[in-house]
Amino acid sequence: MFEGVLPAIVTPFQNDHAKSLDLLGLQSNLAFLVSKGVHGVVPCGSTGESATLSFEEHVKVIEATIEAVAGKVPVLAGAGSNNTDEAIRFTRSAKDLGADGVLIISPYYNRPNRSGLIKHFSAIADLDIPVVLYNVPSRTGQNLSPDLVAELSRHPNIVGIKEASGNISQVSQIIEETMDQDFTVISGDDGMTLPVMALGGGGVISVAANVEPERMVGMYRAYTEGDWDDAISLHYELAPLFRALFIDSNPIPVKKAINLRGLASGPLRLPLDELDAEKTAALTEVLSTYD
């Protein structure tokens, strides 16, 4: 269900110091992405500034996303928290709204032990909705080890992992240890998309696809159709963008990039702040090469 290129979408805010959502802008962005052939969308993730959204705003963003894509592509809704009860509340809401699955980041800051992680993810998966785990140690301070992921993959509702550890050996081991399950490993790093797919992964949850959806979809399609040379060529064509979108904390650069492309973005919510002039100039220069 969750394979291909799935943009982790931004949450546009109004120009009122980001106090309110721009849902019309969100839906316009989604129409653009779907028209470019993306295979799914991921609202309310890190790129969507989920940490600064209220519960009510989570509901509105997911509801607007589901309405906008109108069944054309699956919606994998961010529903994670370092509070298990809150993650359950987010997940139950996403399920009731009609999301196709939920993306659950590993609990951050409180650093649970192994048994706590198993109980946390299992309690969410027991709500009977497809769950994709999200491993991003650079943000959470904790790594989901391959053997832990393999154990979790045996839960019938845990269907995949967004792997953003940056460790290709770990990705390989996860794929190896989950081959006997209906379980998909998805890259959480645009620059690792092809290496992960070459090992048997299913695609990417992408930041860059907000900016260059056609090229990202083209790279995925070239690989799946056996045109390895074209896939590699597109990877290197996109590599400067991959780097530029992380010249500052995500989603600061990507919100600036889509704004420069004429898509809905709006301001960031504190504690995130706008890209400075020097980095904006560098990003603009990279974007100009894709015009």
Curated annotation (Swiss-Prot):
One of its GO terms (cellular component) is cytoplasm. Its EC number is 4.3.3.7. It comes from the Archaea. Keywords: Amino-acid biosynthesis, Cytoplasm, Diaminopimelate biosynthesis, Lyase, Lysine biosynthesis, Schiff base. It is found in: Cytoplasm. Pyruvate binds at T47, I205. Pathway: Amino-acid biosynthesis; L-lysine biosynthesis via DAP pathway; (S)-tetrahydrodipicolinate from L-aspartate: step 3/4. Its main location: cytoplasm. The record marks S46, Y109 as: Part of a proton relay during catalysis. GO terms for molecular function: 2-dehydro-3-deoxy-phosphogluconate aldolase activity; 4-hydroxy-tetrahydrodipicolinate synthase activity. Coiled coil: none annotated. GO terms for biological process: diaminopimelate biosynthetic process; lysine biosynthetic process via diaminopimelate. The keyword Ribonucleoprotein does not apply. It holds the Pfam family DHDPS. The active site is at Y134, K162. It is an enzyme of class 4 (lyase). It catalyses: L-aspartate 4-semialdehyde + pyruvate = (2S,4S)-4-hydroxy-2,3,4,5-tetrahydrodipicolinate + H2O + H(+). Catalyzes the condensation of (S)-aspartate-beta-semialdehyde [(S)-ASA] and pyruvate to 4-hydroxy-tetrahydrodipicolinate (HTPA). Homotetramer; dimer of dimers. Belongs to the DapA family. This is 4-hydroxy-tetrahydrodipicolinate synthase. The gene is dapA.
